[in-house]
Amino acid sequence: MRLTRRAFVQAAAAPLLAPPQQAPPAQAALTVAHLVDRIRAAVGPWREKTVDGIKAGDPSVALTGVAVTVAARLENLRRAASAGCNLVITQEPVFYGANDDPGNRASDAVYLAKKAYIDQAKLVLWRFSDHWSTRQPDPRVAAIAEALSWQDGPGSDNIYRIPETSLSSLMAHVSTRLGLRGGMRTVGPPGMRVRTVLVSPGTTDLATTVARLKGADVVLAGEPREWEVVPYVLDARESGAAKALISIGRIVSEEPGMHACAAWIRTLAPGLRVEALPVSDPFWNAAS
């Protein structure tokens, strides 16, 4: 069939005369508050009384990236900003006190310098401690065990079975794998044989020790209450029980768990920059 000149012109002009296609609506930017809501939904019921929450900054801002750390020290805040992360998620307090209330620090030069940097860098600080540490199974315990290459365990009591070793060899293994510089203290004889270890990151109180030490040779503790836990372990030994305590420091004991937290957050926001910022052992001694 022969195409007339008129038909040809009409066919050529048709795309120009058609109504314009509407562009798809732009996707709203993910804000800090959006991600916090996702995390809260993923961990389940939110406690009425908790230390967790926004400690500084505006959560309504667009999220550029997340830095996860066990301690939001000024050094790590600078690293977060340099990495393009405007949300810092921390296990420990931002402003030193348990509830981040400045109290008598409100006019302190150190507090003011930190607050000024947060404001200047437009960072948002969110504490995520209570709800992360009470997940079951405890992700902090699992992360320490993974760092130490312990596979056998735990039960609900956080006790791991390990290849038999001496207490001094266990100390060396823990020190090397967790990067301790000087924060380890031990109760018990170096040659004591060890087969089972109770892993207790963070604060180790007397109730936990009494309830669980029966099934373990050693407590691997973060920050034991020295006036409670140490006398109990010493008296257990004096009573004939072969028990020991290794204290590695709170920060060292919590850090592997926050690296695991960063990996978990990546699953909630695929494609989002999520950095795990190490803190490492803040202590040193003459032998390190």
Q: Which ranges hold each PLM region?
A:
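Hydrophobic structural segments
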Residues: R2-S288
